Design a protein with these regions (language model features):
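Short, non-helical or kinked segments that cap or interrupt transmembrane helices
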Residues: 20-42, 82-95, 172
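Alpha-helical transmembrane segments of multi-pass integral membrane proteins
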Residues: 133-174
Length: 182
């Protein structure tokens, strides 16, 4: 159960980390769900189109594509709230409402009127960590039949913690978020 929870929590961890940077900088981003939907949609489309060419690297590159699309939608939210002075909640709600509709529309356009895509060809699959899976009790819970992106998400969370709380950039980010005139 724990390994399945780790697998399914990876997208939420990555999205939560993006939201943490947004909140720490003083931008309330309620559009994270819409950002996640568009990232997932773009990753699936990428995977379906390039799986034959890229092979086993396809899911990892699709993960980067999903992150780039997520950054794009976050930039739209940032421009709307900072430059255009839109309300944070309204802008985020628009992204949350626009993203699923846009994903369904693009699915119908790209896949000839069908409301769904084909199954992805290349996925991350499940892995067991060779040495760590042999640890009594803990090895079976955390390191058997799990997915590598889950551990990449946890490692990214640790890196983000270091960036936010131990670097000059993080100090500036937090100070601007607490007091925008700083």
């Amino acid at each position: 159960i724990v390994s399945s929870a780790l697998i399914y929590s990876a997208p939420l961890i990555f999205t939560g980390l993006g939201g943490t940077f947004s909140e720490r900088s003083g931008i309330v981003n309620v559009g994270l769900e819409g950002t996640m939907v568009m990232g997932a949609f773009s990753a699936i489309v990428f995977n379906l189109n390039y799986a034959d060419n890229l092979g086993k690297m396809t899911p990892w590159i699709a993960l980067l594509v999903a992150g780039a699309v997520g950054i794009f939608f976050s930039i739209i939210h940032a421009v709307a709230t900072i430059n255009l002075r839109a309300n944070h909640i309204v802008s985020g709600t628009v992204i949350n409402m626009l993203a699923p509709a846009l994903a369904v529309f693009l699915t119908k356009v790209l896949y000839e009127g069908k409301g769904q895509t084909a199954f992805i060809v290349q996925n991350f699959g499940k892995t067991s960590f060779p040495v760590l899976k042999d640890i009594p009790i803990i090895g079976q819970i955390f390191f058997t039949n799990t997915s590598a992106p889950a551990y990449a998400a946890i490692a990214t969370a640790l890196v983000c913690y270091f960036i936010i709380f131990k670097t000059t950039f993080g100090l500036r980010l937090r100070s601007v978020g607490e007091h925008p005139q700083a």
